[in-house]
Amino acid sequence: IQLARNGFYGAAPNPMVGAVIVHDGKIIGEGYHVRCGGPHAEVNAVRSVRNPELLKESTIYVSLEPCSHYGKTPPCADLIVEKGIPRVVVGCMDPFAKVAGRGIRKLQEAGIEVTVGVLEAECLALNRRFITFHTHHRPYITLKWAESADGFMDSLRTDYEKEKPYAFSTPYTRMLVHRCRAEHQAILVGRQTALADNPSLNLRMWPGKSPLRLVIDRRGDLPGHLALFNDGAE
């Protein structure tokens, strides 16, 4: 799971996956899915093994079910069968329609011992965005707001142009907000927030790519000078 997290920024929209190969109680290979379109975790783990002959007496641990279909890369289940790895331990099933248990069946039909559901909750949580999309057919949504101890989200203002919004966030929590932006593909606010706070909604305090900015506005007449329309806005 820790290995898989290394692919957070590069693997999307694919899931994060980590793989570890163990022989006689010792790790002899490891890998993770670095970027979409590149080799999967199982491939990188196999390639990292110095003595391929040991694979025939090893166990491969993988956080997500090995794929069984041809996409941008060949099936990882086929690679495991080809290398003669006798045991596979899987964290959780892959809900993607082209996999969804087929990888497990392919391994079992080849005579490989397969164990599924080890640290399953942690593996599902790791790819909660991917899992939500393929099981509920909707985006994974995170709600974010800042409020005072007595439940207020802003001071009373009558002129948004002259009166700036009251900042409840600390430097540390602002950094966490930008980390959250880096971990999501889009950020959504309403018309009133766009006018009252004039937010940039871009990424500044954390490495990564700024999310797609979305505004719900029934009127469709937001002024063009708002910061969210300017990529360089600070």
Model-derived features with residue positions:
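Short, basic/aromatic recognition patches
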Residues: I1-A12, F133
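Short, small/polar residue-rich loop motifs at catalytic or cofactor-binding pockets
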Residues: P13-M16, Y140-I141
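Short beta-strand scaffold segments in enzyme catalytic cores
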Residues: V17-G25, K144-A146
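Zn2+-dependent cytidine deaminase-like catalytic core
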Residues: I21-E122, L212
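Short, charged, surface-exposed secondary-structure boundary motifs
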Residues: A100, A125-L126, P223-H225
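A polyampholytic, Gly/Pro-enriched intrinsically disordered region
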Residues: E109-V116, F133-L143
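Short, structured interface segments
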Residues: G117-H134
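Active-site ligand-binding patch in enzyme domains
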Residues: T132, Y140-E234
